[in-house]
């Protein structure tokens, strides 16, 4: 949501971002689902031993770049590898997206999302073994009249400590509230 507001202000057009699904897949299944060429932004999950992926369609990247450089988002192009100039423009957008993601996660855990690199071919990205389970959060990104896909991918081993801490917080919250709720129910 925060990133959507940022894009609205930068692109000066209507932008909406919504979660379409949250899935657990084998890493190999996720990689096979990515078309080539693509825009695969790899980032470090500082505070864990893991690395994550923000994968966006090249059409979305091209649409953002075109709009930022004075064009409109109504043009559609065939997917292609983005140029070094387009990569430089998108890097700032992606770094801002990662900062917004970090803000969104702050209520759950203190994680730092640090941009690492861009890959355009899925075969060159190895953040986990093929048989590792990953969490994939899929988003629908609407820019103007066009809809694009964006995915976040986290290996489960990178989130284990976070999930353990989250479960402990939920349990302690429940145990603190339980006696109070019991009294209310007895009255």
Which residue stretches match the model-derived regions?
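N-terminal auxiliary interaction/assembly segments of multi-subunit proteins
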Residues: 1-187
């Amino acid at each position: 949501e925060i990133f959507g507001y940022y894009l609205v202000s930068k692109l000066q057009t209507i932008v909406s971002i919504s979660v379409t699904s949250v899935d657990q897949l084998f890493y190999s299944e996720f990689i096979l689902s990515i078309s080539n060429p693509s825009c695969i932004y790899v980032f470090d999950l500082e505070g864990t031993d893991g690395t994550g992926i923000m994968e966006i369609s090249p059409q979305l990247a091209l649409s953002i770049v075109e709009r930022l450089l004075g064009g409109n988002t109504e043009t559609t192009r065939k997917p292609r590898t983005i140029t070094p100039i387009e990569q430089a423009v998108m890097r700032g957008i992606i770094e801002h997206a990662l900062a917004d993601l970090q803000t969104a996660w702050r209520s759950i855990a203190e994680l730092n999302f640090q941009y690492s690199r861009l890959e355009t071919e899925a075969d060159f990205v190895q953040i986990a073994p093929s048989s590792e389970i990953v969490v994939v959060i899929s988003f629908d990104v609407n820019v103007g009249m066009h809809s694009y896909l964006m995915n976040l991918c986290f290996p489960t081993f990178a989130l284990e400590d976070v999930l353990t801490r989250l479960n402990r917080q939920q349990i302690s919250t429940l145990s603190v509230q339980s006696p109070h709720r019991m009294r209310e129910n007895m009255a």
